[in-house]
């Protein structure tokens, strides 16, 4: 998996996994030594290019002694130029910072923040409880709050009092998981919202913040028990696996819209965004 984003000045940021110990890194970068195994992603890398893509501004490894990889679309840049990445690691020595959300080395999902110059790890944490979690979606708002979405097999996530749903819906099959949504404060990196949401489904999910205070969350649940709203396109699933699209108010984290849609077999939604205040475009 990999991710790419562009900041307001046109600089290009790329994150991914590498098995190459000679992957190009720059002097003074956070980590210039390859740490991982040469399989399943090796180490994560974060690289910043100039706007024309002709020069490396900085490039660094991030990882432990086993292996890790970045989540799809798992890189964003906040208003201060800090670089946020999410992914999965199997390394017990993956670099963490003080005041982390979770330091349990059984956890495989991670969330990390690099300084604008790529030289300092400002924040890094595992995310989860007692079983494997996967972070599949990452977005930030205009106040630099971080939103993540993903999937879990565990009932032990630290849900908040204002959660939409506080209990997991146990998957009926070993390859299915329950979706979760979390909001993390920009300054103290504490969880301000965490909820189970979309019933059991595959782990892929997409999340996108847009003005004014709208949070789109999409994925592919099984239809049973999905919390559709009265204005949904479809309130019942039609196939083995359906798409869902939902909209939250990002300030209150209240659900404003949720719908299922799809055909008679398996369907997956991979991206979505508003093109005006009332219209969402989706792709999958």
Located regions from the model:
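A sequence-level/structural motif corresponding to short, flexible coil/turn segments enriched
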Residues: 1-284
